[in-house]
């Protein structure tokens, strides 16, 4: 299950079964289009962030500087991907166990968020700090999970992810959840609910039915 909804190099597929690696979709780490090299992990097309160097494969390979801190993506790198199949057990009701109370305006926003989730559309939630944005998304998350969907809450900042994790876990105690950020020693687990830094999203591909990005105006996401 390590590969479902993800795109990884061979060295990152430590726990994947060999049979699944054979079945996985494969594409090169770097490709060329219209005279430009493109990193298929981070999307970088800046020539200044592509360098060439002798490689262990026996040739000179270009590699991407833009996502180098997540491991080197080279011309000879092969990325492995299996489509997301949402192989999760349906959570037992009540999925959402938050006991708080929304104000009338918060409730209206929450209902509109649920409508957006059900219609599979995009919505911007814009409010001052402390307005209860996190609590307003709870019903939207629950609506997606009830349909067997996969949900990710992402932020450019590790501290925000660490602050969100216990609040989300308390609201959805019966739903398996993974927390992903650089340096986290817990590693990856295949779960219906994910909290991750935006950098970690580069290892996913078409994985989530609902993606919520917090602090969207923060560096480095914006």
Tell what function each PLM region has.
Residues 198-222:
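SF2 helicase catalytic motif II
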Residues 98-121:
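N-terminal pre-P-loop "Q-motif" helix
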Residues 86-98:
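Conserved adenine-nucleotide phosphate-binding loops and their immediately adjacent elements
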Residues 149-157:
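Conserved RecA-like ASCE P-loop NTPase motor core of nucleic-acid helicases/translocases
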């Amino acid at each position: 299950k390590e590969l479902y909804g993800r795109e990884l190099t061979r060295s990152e597929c430590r726990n994947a079964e060999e049979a699944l690696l054979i079945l996985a979709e494969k594409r090169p780490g770097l490709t060329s289009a219209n005279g430009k090299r493109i990193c298929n992990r981070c999307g970088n097309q800046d020539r200044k962030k592509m360098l060439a160097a002798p490689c262990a494969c026996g040739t000179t390979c270009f590699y991407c500087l833009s996502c180098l801190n997540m491991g080197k993506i080279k011309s000879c790198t092969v990325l492995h991907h299996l489509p997301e199949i949402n192989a999760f057990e349906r959570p037992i009701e009540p999925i959402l166990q938050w006991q708080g109370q929304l104000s009338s305006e918060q409730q209206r926003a929450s209902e509109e968020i649920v409508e957006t989730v059900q219609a599979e559309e995009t919505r911007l939630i814009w409010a001052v700090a402390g307005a209860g944005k996190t609590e307003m998304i709870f019903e939207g998350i629950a609506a997606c999970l009830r349909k067997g969907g996969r949900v990710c809450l992402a932020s450019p900042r590790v501290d925000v992810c660490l602050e969100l994790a216990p609040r989300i876990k308390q609201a959805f105690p019966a739903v398996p959840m993974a927390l992903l950020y650089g340096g986290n020693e817990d590693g990856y687990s295949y779960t219906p609910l994910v909290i991750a830094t935006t950098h970690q999203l580069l290892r996913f591909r078409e994985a989530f039915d609902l993606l919520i990005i917090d602090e969207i105006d923060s560096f480095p996401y914006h």
